[in-house]
Amino acid sequence: MIVQCLLAVRGLHRVGGSRILFRMTLGREEMSPLQAMSSYMAAGRNVLRWDLSPEQIKTRTEELISQTKQVYDAIGMRDIKEVTYENCLQALADIEVKYIVERTMLDFPQHVSSDKEVRAASTEADKRLSRFDIEMSMRQDIFLRIVHLKETCDLEKIKPEARRYLEKSVKMGKRNGLHLPEQVQNEIKAMKKRMSELCIDFNKNLNEDDTFLVFSKAELGALPDDFINSLEKTDGDKYKITLKYPHYFPVMKKCCVPETRRKMEMAFNTRCKEENTVILQQLLPLRAEVARLLGYSTHADFVLEMNTAKSTRHVTAFLDDLSQKLKPLGEAEREFILNLKKKECKERGFEYDGKINAWDLHYYMTQTEELKYSVDQETLKEYFPIEVVTEGLLNIYQELLGLSFEQVTDAHVWNKSVTLYTVKDKATGEVLGQFYLDLYPREGKYNHAACFGLQPGCLLPDGSRMMSVAALVVNFSQPLAGRPSLLRHDEVRTYFHEFGHVMHQICAQTDFARFSGTNVETDFVEVPSQMLENWVWDADSLRRLSKHYRHGSPITDDLLEKLVASRLVNTGLLTLRQIVLSKVDQSLHTNTALDAASEYAKYCTEILGVAATPGTNMPATFGHLAGGYDGQYYGYLWSEVFSMDMFYSCFKKEGIMNPEVGMKYRNLILKPGGSLDGMDMLQNFLTREPNQKAFLMSRGLPAP
């Protein structure tokens, strides 16, 4: 998942809050109110600070609002006939960079700080700044000057990226309703402010959730000793199991006690149920009403207009077609799982209920992998200590993309476990950016896996380039005494995926902050990172990523062959579940009268063939709904069509570590950032229109 500092200028929500904003900022002549910010705006520097106290966060938030508002006010009073490219468009870009960087220091700590008071202050700053963003985004005086500039300037005389910036600015202004009557604008503004707060609260609730369950050792049957020994014990000699990924998934995949899995699945899918259900009941109608006032049939239609899919009709057709193609495969996989369950219930003396329950799915899919391919993930993870995986991952990316990474000593970070690296072009030595690695869970930390864009890589007023900065935030298991953190293969894949987002953020070289890094269409943003997941299914790459944590021996060829062969295991059910989530997301954003829990239950039964557990409400735990993927979750599958096409037609054909193909990918897919449309970048790379052939093959389906 990608969480960008620049989602604001795309008019999307982001994890932790919404920045629904067309940032109409101002020019060089009026920069004096922001001189206090200018001291840290320097080329080739990471200017971010992570030591702000709650009081400083609050003070700097108000200062940022005051200073920025003065700039907006000044441009709003400018005689419209005096508006030029230099004093308006270029000036917008200059101020935008400063605002983004300062804002990042104020709102990012809510996701990663170890201090609860800092997280709370950061969350409040995000809410306060989001309200301010909306106010500024809906200033008609600024919008009219942008429109005037577009109508009067010679577009052919400005650079293509500047022309795109101008056209997108006008488009975003209209998508904010600035062409509508004042009364309608005020309605939209009020609703957007409320939506922003709801999104922030939705994900804050999930991040702060500290639910845990208590089990005896017998109730954790079949779980490995190293996992059980890592758990905190209660006074009654039982074990605490949290709902964080490093606890939840091992239990769901390996615990042989159905009742334990049932309790865990029930708790996991009722996290924040009461409060987040209420939030969704408020948020979804607000989105629909804003879309209606802007002239769209539904919120999904509103957001899809800016994506490569363009319409709900195209998305529905894509999901329904894929669902039908996968139906036979899903049925076969369910039948196999049901037979496994029947056999195990007989052997262990459990009651066999004749169906696959939600808490059975991960467990029996793991057994399927072990039986069909002899892949034991517990044995396998001993070859993936996190230090070895990290070193191998960094080496592969450096070699593939022509980069060099250097760890920064004594780096300024938000937690002692976080590391910082500088990225340089290997050929020229030019510094491109920096990235943080925040790998382990902490109380209150963002509880999924994501790349956060923190500092945009773009041009500064003096023509020099600001380096891009990103953070990879994941939650792998903590190291134990005498044993490093060991990763499951699916965690290695997650690591590669999210680091692909980091490379997109770092390698993009754009003029404008608005187009920097991963600031592309939402249904294209996953393409680069998904494409790079293929490396964790390549035997040679896996050798570079692995070494036994105790004796340092390489992973055996036999184990490698089995792992690579297992790529297609459970692919039908896994893809059908993605379709379920995509359909739920589309449904909730096309018909607000629907009940989220009921809609999820309906599609689980109809498409996945595994009923949702009564009493749960998975959508209330679905952070994507409030994190920038509203109406756009389909993008994960949609993007895979493109990513698989790129991999099989170029990398697989020419060699996955071929440096020429790697540089072509870096230059044609990563470097443009959002300065080109996603489909144009794809066609430049493929030299043809993309097709579904490779994607269908990757799912074990016949290609047309």
UniProtKB/Swiss-Prot annotation:
Gene3D superfamilies, A to Z: Collagenase (Catalytic Domain) (3.40.390.10), Endopeptidase. Chain P, domain 1 (1.20.1050.40), Neurolysin, domain 3 (1.10.1370.10)
Sites of N6-acetyllysine modification: 664
Compartments where found: Mitochondrion intermembrane space; Cytoplasm, Cytosol
Cofactor detail note: Binds 1 zinc ion per subunit.
This protein's UniProt keywords: Acetylation, Cytoplasm, Hydrolase, Metal-binding, Metalloprotease, Mitochondrion, Protease, Transit peptide, Zinc
GO BP terms in the entry: peptide metabolic process; proteolysis
Record GO terms (molecular function): metal ion binding; metalloendopeptidase activity
Residues binding Zn(2+), per UniProt: 497, 501, 504
Keyword Metal-binding: yes
Disulfide bonds: none
Summary of the function given for this chain in its UniProt record: Hydrolyzes oligopeptides such as neurotensin, bradykinin and dynorphin A. Acts as a regulator of cannabinoid signaling pathway by mediating degradation of hemopressin, an antagonist peptide of the cannabinoid receptor CNR1.
Name by which UniProt lists this protein: Neurolysin, mitochondrial
Organism: Bos taurus
Gene transcribed to yield this protein: NLN
